[in-house]
């Protein structure tokens, strides 16, 4: 099983249109049908995912499930110095995307003039609203990588803006699309009694705790449990770990462990009526890239707005619980407070 950090290391070593304003969804479908040209995508932000996605999508020998899209151009805006990649890392990412045939451009406007859809890949959630708004105003569907924003209000503003401009938006962790989480999600979710998941959970002070990295394990939890978490409490928080418990409808229980000390990996266990299933670890970025292609070619997000907003509300409630010494926090009430439909 490939390790996520090993994939990133290997990637670094190997170097591996306009006119959509009226109806971006129908026009993308038209462009991706029959013998039409591939949908041209633009990327905002040099990052690990920019390099990986460019390598997959611009591979001349890619399989049919990646057909329909290619990355045409990339713009890298100045980043906040507290979370920006090193000069060496940025140079490696730039080399990889250019090797894949991606043109580096000097502005968002230049990028938007060249592409049909956009991926926001800056690793910092704080500037995402500023970066995504011109894309939405141009009517171009957008994938926003995690974290969508630095806090729940920011996440909601971005999704509300997408709704205002009637533009498709999609966000997801790659861990959602592991083979075992997907098998349970598609065929056995109604049998799930509860689940435990874990992932690395490094913290970034400018972001709500789990938004920065713990979201990977939280999204695995939601993939198998579904929406409907009613309350959450953080039963443990230290330098090395976060442990939190959520209660779903029908008294189903989900537990997430965020790891900062010791061996860092991804995984979990799902408890069902007649089986106990191990979820497995990180399987690479390709399964997510397949879903990104699906999104841009159909105009339909594989993950609903309601589920994405609840995931971020869940992580926000966990943070509130931590600040209150581990008290239970109602996810349902928090969603109402922030105007998230329940």
Identify the residue ranges that each predicted region occupies.
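Short helix/strand-capping hinge loops at secondary-structure junctions
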Residues: 139-141, 146-147
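Hydrophobic residues in well-ordered beta-strands that form the structural core
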Residues: 106, 144, 169-171
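Rossmann-like dinucleotide-binding domain that binds NAD(P)(H)
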Residues: 195-263, 306-309
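N-terminal glycine-/serine-/threonine-rich beta1-alpha1-beta2 phosphate-ribose binding loop
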Residues: 2-138, 163-164, 237, 324, ...
């Amino acid at each position: 099983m490939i390790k996520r950090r090993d994939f990133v290391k290997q990637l670094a070593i190997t170097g591996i249109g306009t006119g959509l304003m009226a109806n971006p969804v129908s026009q993308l479908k038209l462009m991706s049908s029959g013998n039409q040209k591939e949908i041209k995508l633009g990327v905002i932000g040099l990052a690990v995912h920019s390099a990986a996605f460019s390598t997959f999508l611009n591979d001349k020998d890619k399989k049919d499930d990646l057909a329909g899209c290619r990355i045409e151009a990339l713009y890298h805006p100045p980043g906040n110095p507290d979370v920006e990649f090193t000069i060496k890392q940025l140079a490696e990412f730039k080399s990889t995307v250019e090797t894949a045939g991606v043109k580096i451009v000097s502005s968002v406007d230049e990028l938007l003039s060249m592409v049909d859809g956009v991926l926001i890949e800056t690793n910092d959630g704080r500037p995402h609203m500023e970066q995504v708004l011109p894309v939405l105003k141009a009517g171009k569907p957008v994938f926003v990588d995690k974290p969508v924003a630095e806090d729940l209000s920011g996440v909601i503003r971005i999704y509300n803006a997408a709704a205002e401009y009637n533009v498709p938006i999609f966000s997801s962790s790659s861990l959602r699309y592991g083979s075992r989480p997907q098998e349970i999600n598609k065929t056995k979710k109604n049998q799930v009694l509860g689940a435990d998941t874990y992932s690395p959970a490094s913290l970034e002070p400018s972001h709500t705790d789990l938004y920065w990295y713990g979201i990977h394990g939280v999204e695995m939890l939601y993939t198998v449990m579904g929406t409907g978490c009613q309350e959450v409490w953080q039963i443990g928080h230290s330098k090395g770990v976060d442990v939190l418990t959520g209660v779903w409808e029908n008294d189903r229980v989900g537990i997430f462990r965020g790891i900062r000390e010791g061996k860092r990996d991804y995984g979990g266990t799902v408890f069902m009526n007649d089986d106990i299933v191990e979820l497995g670890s990180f399987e690479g970025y390709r399964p997510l890239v397949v879903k990104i292609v699906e999104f841009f070619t159909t105009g339909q997000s594989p993950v609903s707005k309601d589920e994405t907003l609840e995931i971020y509300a869940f992580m926000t409630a966990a943070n509130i619980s931590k600040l209150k010494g581990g008290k239970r926090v109602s996810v349902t009430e928090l969603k109402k407070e922030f105007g998230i439909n329940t």
